[in-house]
């Protein structure tokens, strides 16, 4: 059903070329592979060529929706280029339509990320001001020719933004009464049924009959990876393919239940799914009720059994081919998605080619499969056993740090309240010693992006503070050295938990004192938390008081560009190894460091074991590094300063380099 016309030719050609080996021949082989796969998956290099190539299947009763290949715009120049490409395509498709209308004639699919280089929730106002007019102009052009325009689905973090654009488009007075607006919804998203409820309500409120293309989803791998990398609470998509199959059928039933406001377009290559929809929709089919869709180069053999008269043994249901248009150079990203999708061992396209899988297993009812799984596992809807939640990514030894989903409106509202609440915090940094410290006049710390904003005040350490701190560290060293590594690890883990709980105020402080964007600030806090947990594991697993002897007082000098992450990483590493720490933060960012130290002390680090000495490198830093009682220096910064420190320290190393 899903055989390709050039599988054998592709395999033999590549085998011959690779067999000759040599880099030039390998390059030629890859180039040939791209061209052969381009012929398989791309309808034409230009819209004119694609329209001509589509005529063969149109004669059999197939319809087409053309997609101009290309990924997200990275620059305004890219966006303008894609906009012009879409405009040209609509003119060409519209002329080729010959007035057949949105259901019988060809249409176009557009990718919103191609129309704006900053298509993200963080740039909401810009998207509405700059991207929406482009979307509207394309939709009006499609209306002029009466061809359908579908807004393609993309990553989950852009879903709500795309829905806002869709709603605004539906209430556009110039589009009143036109039913050619289309939207794509992904069944693998856990929100899919609720998105369908929303678009049904939107269609009723705006008095449009919306075209809704239901797909299973093409970004599964990246959605899983993004959730893990960003430390999200869970996954936006199902972790088991069979759940997506059931979701698809359930959502198809929803779409078919409201024919007055929704024109369903079912995009699937799964014969069982197709059959289920065919039976759910009933035998009383009428033109314009619904249609099936498939990808060019993949689904035509299956749908040749569907499109055509009943008298010819067909099902007499329409199918629209999703037809990519573009050069081989623009094919790669689309091709990778297709290969990932169909290379998965749960893919119907993959499984049908596997002769070891029986026809009964291939067309098994997904509901029955889930019931069987539930019997074996003791419950319904359990996640994939080999895909842990983002927090459990590193196993039982340590938790992954939690992030904040910056596309989640509830999280953004909570963050906004927290930032407002802490905006007037009286942030302070001063020497934090295990003994008495000096009392100097504090100086204001200004927001680098707004010098009118006084973030807080810093009192810099004096030479006497440095000398006293080193002596305090020496006094505290035996206590910390004798502390069992497991206890040191537990303290670092408590510090990580405290820091994670303070992510919102820390974000505000990082933004105001260090000039961080919120996305960078989240990453900074998470990295600091990860450092604390990582070194806790190292202490617990790799250190014993019998086998490892700490160095003694260690100076940690950190930079301004990572004032929390690198600062915390240096401190955590030294503490995990049993050393007392003298922390000298960058002079530009003492407030962040002071708050980090407060959290670590609150977690249970004894007085004198961790001390903060804010101040300038040429005074505080030089005094610390030059003292013979200091046994180790951890430094992150410029090469120039590193060489100065190296020269300073090298003169007092013993025969063992200590």
Give the label of every model feature segment.
Residues 313-315, 326, 330-333, 337-471, ...:
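Terminal low-complexity tails and localization/encapsulation signals of metabolic enzymes
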Residues 542-544, 548-557, 602-658:
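Conserved NAD(P)+-binding/catalytic subdomain of aldehyde/semialdehyde dehydrogenases
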Residues 1-400:
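Positively charged, amphipathic and often flexible ligand-engagement surfaces
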Residues 67-69, 111-113, 150-154, 184-186, ...:
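Generic beta-strand/beta-sheet core signal
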Residues 92-95, 140-141, 168-171, 254-257, ...:
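Conserved helix-loop functional segments at active or binding sites
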Residues 541-607:
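Conserved small-residue-rich beta-alpha loop and adjacent elements
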Residues 139, 252, 571-572, 621:
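Generic hydrophobic/aromatic pocket-lining and core-packing "Φ" positions
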Residues 37-48, 58-64, 74, 137, ...:
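Catalytic cores of nucleotide-enabled group-transfer and carboxylate-activating enzymes in metabolic
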């Amino acid at each position: 059903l899903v055989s390709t016309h050039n599988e054998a030719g592709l395999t033999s050609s590549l085998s011959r070329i690779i067999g000759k080996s040599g880099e030039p021949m390998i390059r030629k082989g890859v180039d040939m592979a791209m061209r052969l796969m381009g012929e398989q998956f791309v309808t034409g290099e230009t819209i004119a060529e694609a329209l001509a190539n589509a005529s063969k299947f149109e004669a059999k009763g197939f319809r087409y929706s053309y997609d101009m290949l290309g990924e997200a715009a990275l620059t305004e120049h890219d966006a303008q280029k894609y906009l012009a490409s879409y405009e040209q395509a609509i003119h060409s498709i519209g002329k080729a339509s010959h007035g057949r209308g949105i259901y019988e004639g060809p249409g176009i699919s557009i990718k919103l990320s191609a129309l704006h280089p900053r298509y993200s929730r963080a740039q909401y106002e810009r998207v509405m001001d700059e991207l929406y007019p482009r979307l509207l102009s394309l939709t009006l052009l499609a209306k002029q020719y009466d061809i359908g325009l579908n807004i393609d689905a993309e990553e989950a973090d852009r879903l709500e933004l795309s829905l806002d654009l869709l709603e605004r488009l539906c209430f556009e007075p110039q589009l009143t009464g036109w039913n050619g607006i289309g939207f794509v919804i992904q069944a693998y998203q856990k929100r899919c049924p609720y998105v369908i409820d929303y678009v049904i309500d939107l269609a009723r409120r705006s008095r449009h009959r919306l075209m809704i293309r239901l797909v299973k989803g093409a970004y599964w791998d990246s959605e899983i990876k993004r959730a893990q990398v960003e430390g999200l609470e869970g996954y936006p998509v199902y972790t088991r393919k069979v759940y997506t199959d059931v979701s698809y059928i359930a959502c198809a039933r929803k779409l078919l239940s409201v024919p007055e406001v929704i024109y369903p377009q079912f995009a699937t290559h799964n014969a069982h799914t197709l059959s289920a929809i065919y039976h759910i929709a009933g035998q009383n089919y009428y033109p314009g009720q619904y249609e099936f869709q498939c990808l060019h180069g993949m689904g035509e053999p299956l749908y040749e059994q569907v499109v055509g008269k009943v008298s010819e043994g067909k099902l007499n249901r329409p199918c629209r081919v999703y037809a990519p248009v573009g050069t081989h150079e623009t094919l790669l990203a689309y091709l990778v998605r297709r290969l990932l999708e169909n290379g998965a061992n749960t893919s119907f396209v993959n499984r049908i080619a596997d002769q070891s899988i029986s026809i009964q297993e291939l067309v098994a009812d997904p509901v029955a499969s889930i019931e069987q799984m539930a019997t074996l596992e003791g419950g319904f809807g359990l996640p994939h056993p080999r895909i842990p939640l983002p927090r459990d990514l590193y196993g039982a030894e340590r938790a992954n740090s939690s992030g904040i989903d910056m596309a989640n409106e509830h999280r953004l509202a909570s963050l906004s309240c927290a930032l407002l609440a802490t905006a007037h915090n009286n942030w302070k940094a001063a020497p934090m010693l295990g003994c008495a410290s000096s009392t100097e006049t504090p100086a204001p710390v200004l927001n680098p992006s707004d010098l009118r904003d006084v973030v807080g005040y810093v009192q810099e350490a004096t030479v006497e503070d440095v000398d006293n701190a080193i002596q305090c560290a020496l006094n505290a060293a035996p206590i910390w050295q004798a502390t069992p590594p497991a206890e040191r690890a537990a303290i670092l883990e408590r510090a990580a938990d405290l820091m994670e709980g303070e992510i919102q105020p820390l974000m505000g402080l990082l933004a105001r004192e260090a000039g961080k964007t919120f996305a960078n600030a989240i990453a900074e806090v998470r990295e600091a938390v990860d450092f604390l947990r990582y070194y806790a594991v190292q202490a617990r697993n790799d250190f014993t008081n019998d086998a490892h002897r700490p160095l003694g007082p260690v100076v940690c000098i950190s930079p301004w560009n990572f004032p929390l992450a690198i600062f915390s990483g240096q401190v955590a590493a030294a503490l995990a190894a049993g050393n007392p720490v003298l922390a000298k933060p960058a002079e530009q960012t003492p407030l962040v460091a002071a708050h980090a130290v407060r959290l670590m002390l609150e977690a249970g680090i004894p007085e004198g074991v961790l001390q903060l000495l804010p101040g300038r490198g040429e005074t505080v830093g030089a005094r610390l590094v030059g003292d013979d009682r200091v046994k180790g220096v951890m430094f992150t910064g410029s090469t120039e300063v590193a060489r100065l420190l190296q020269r300073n320290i090298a003169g007092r190393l013993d025969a063992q380099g200590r």
